[in-house]
Design a protein with these regions (language model features):
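Hydrophobic or amphipathic alpha-helical targeting/insertion segments
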Residues: 126-158, 165-167
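Short beta-strand segments
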Residues: 84, 141-147, 303-305, 390, ...
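Phosphate-binding chemistry for phosphorylated carbohydrates and sugar-nucleotides
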Residues: 13-16, 21, 25-28, 109-124, ...
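Short, high-confidence coil segments that cap the C-terminus of an alpha-helix
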Residues: 77-78, 132, 136-138, 296-299, ...
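Catalytic-core signal marking the mid-to-C-terminal active-site face
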Residues: 429-550
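Flexible hinge/switch segments at interdomain interfaces of large molecular machines
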Residues: 34-44, 189-193, 259-266, 512-513
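An N-terminal, well-structured beta->alpha segment
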Residues: 2-100, 104, 135, 198-232, ...
């Protein structure tokens, strides 16, 4: 990846989005339903786009919300809908648009008290707590967020009654219905004025913040953190959980300092990410410069992205941990210190996650549930406690309550961040030190992710590749043991290919938004071996694409 000369530096004023212009475009832009890039398109986590290019405008939100109402009726979902919103500039306008449609459809909506911002895990938690013990009148939710993505982006996610990201079958149905409304100039979309929607008998207020914060001791050993006097630094990155951290510190008596509670829809306080864009990614060393600069003031420092579903862990010993490194540490700690978890609860990981997780799980005697990229694949396992933990290589994870029951079925950056403080308290060492102990025993992985150009046709070929189209027998000097196009955990298509040898592997997947494919690679033999894997991976994929396309 080519690193921008601005990476890691404060965002210059000319880079900041013009918020009034952006919000105006949200209301005035008219997407062309005949142009694919301007249609509703649900990715791994909802619909995302930008008002300035007519891919996230009021019409999209009105159409999606009506499509969700249509889906609810068809499924008999008639409980309240928990509606959350993050701090992106387009999120509040989109939340208002959604409320106008929900009120017109008679949906009981739970807005946050005092118009507080709402983290994704707080919405998932609220859905699950409401639905506990119920078989009828089930709740679901919407989170208005583009997650960690740039300030000009808007996003819209739907969480069904299980509390997690909607399955592909659901998002396809909602997407198709929404695009139907767009193509008919919103004919069939019901709507009332915002003032009427706010006054509607179906619009209610819910205390997401305290309901979530008061329950955190059920998933994290807060007493251990308090007793050890762990000094915790937090950077909310101007996100939806900005006011949650002070409440956590007060509730549990923690030595916790929020380095900044600033909220700015242009995110002008951020340092620039690797590619020259502003992105609130807590796993990026370029975006995390503000917290890295003060890490030595704390025993552990943590951050979350804009909707607080992703985490970043900064240690005094090792700086910012790579997501997979922290996941390995978290898994080891949780399965060693959660005596009430089911004995058969497994470890959920994606095909792009480190094989170190497999080695940790094997040492713990726990099965690994390996799935395609996307947190939705962990929902059922977390909901029914057949998984103790589910984590993605992109710094998203959730895990069970201490009693072995479901906590959230969506990613929870707050809980994952607080777990780092628990680990530090219980072990007397920070997660960076714990990671070195793990790799000393199980081997140290070296990882990289690269991008290679691909046409739309080649991307389609890659997503439909079969194992017998990979003809290579060796990878970086080792015999290829497995060629996967379906995930071993659930037999779902991975939308690409994964090639595995004894001490290394790579996975290749097409990008959903750009003309390229991504290669994830890992070696347990060192950087030279890793470079060989990356070099050979591109050749193996190119050869397979030529074979398939001929």
């Amino acid at each position: 990846m080519k690193i921008s000369p601005l990476a890691g530096k404060p965002a210059p004023p000319e880079m900041l989005v013009n918020v009034p212009r952006l919000v105006s475009a949200y209301y005035t832009g008219v997407p062309d339903s005949g142009i694919a890039a301007q249609q509703v398109a649900f990715g791994t986590s909802g619909h995302r786009g930008c008002a300035l290019v007519n891919s996230f405008n009021e019409r999209h939100v009105l159409a999606i919300t009506q499509a969700i109402c249509h889906y609810r009726v068809g499924q008999g979902i008639d409980g309240p809908l928990f509606l959350g919103v993050d701090t992106h500039a387009l999120s509040a306008p989109a939340c208002s648009s959604a409320l106008e449609v929900l009120a017109a459809n008679g949906v009981h909506v739970m807005l946050a008290e005092h118009d507080e911002y709402t983290p994704t895990p707080a919405v998932s938690h609220a859905i699950l707590v409401y639905n506990r013990g119920r078989t009828t009148g089930l709740a679901d939710g919407i989170v208005v967020t583009p997650s960690h993505n740039p300030p000009e982006d808007g996003g819209f996610k739907y969480n069904p009654p299980h509390g997690g990201p909607a399955e592909t079958a659901i998002t396809r149905a909602i997407q198709a219905q929404a695009n139907h409304y767009l193509s008919r100039d919103l004919h069939g979309v019901a709507r009332v004025p915002l003032a009427q929607a706010l006054r509607a008998a179906t619009t209610h207020r819910h205390d997401y913040l305290h309901t979530y914060v008061d329950d955190l001791s059920e998933v994290i050993d807060m007493a251990a953190i308090r007793a050890a006097g762990v000094r915790v630094g937090v950077d909310p990155l101007g996100g939806a959980g900005v006011h949650y951290w002070a409440a956590i510190a007060e509730k549990y008596g923690l030595d916790l300092t929020v380095v900044s509670e600033a909220i700015d829809p242009a995110f002008g306080f951020m340092t620039v990410d690797w590619d020259g864009r502003i992105r609130m990614d807590p796993s990026s060393p370029y975006a995390m410069q503000r917290l890295l600069a003060v890490k030595d003031r704390f025993d552990i420092a943590v951050a979350c992205d804009t909707d607080h579903d992703r985490h970043g862990i900064v240690t005094r010993s090792s700086g910012l941990l790579r997501p997979d490194h922290y996941l390995a540490v978290a898994i080891q700690h949780l399965f060693q210190h959660r005596a009430n978890w089911p004995a058969d609860a497994g470890v959920g990981k994606t095909v792009a996650s480190s094989a170190l997780i497999d080695r940790v799980a094997a040492r713990l005697g726990r099965r690994v549930f390996e799935v395609p990229v996307g947190f939705k694949w962990f929902v059922d396992g977390l909901f029914h406690s057949s998984l103790g933990f589910g984590g993605e290589e992109s710094a998203g994870a959730s895990f069970l309550r201490r009693d072995g029951t479901v906590w959230t079925t969506d990613k929870d950056g707050i809980a994952a961040a607080l777990l780092a403080a628990e680990i530090t308290a219980v072990a007397g060492r920070d997660p960076g030190e714990m990671y070195r102990e793990i790799t000393h025993a199980l081997g140290e992985p070296f990882a990289d992710r690269v991008e290679a150009p691909a046409t739309a046709a080649q991307k389609q070929l890659l997503s439909a590749l079969s194992g017998d189209q990979v003809h290579a027998k060796q990878l970086a000097g080792e015999t290829i043991e497995h060629v996967l196009t379906r995930a071993p955990g659930n037999d779902a298509a991975i939308g690409g290919v994964k090639v595995i040898a004894k001490n290394g592997w790579f996975a290749a997947r097409p990008s959903g938004t750009e003309d390229l494919y991504k290669i994830y690679a890992e070696s347990f033999l060192g950087q030279d071996h890793l470079r060989r894997i990356v070099d050979e991976a591109q050749g193996i994929v190119d050869d397979a694409l030529q074979t398939q396309g001929s």
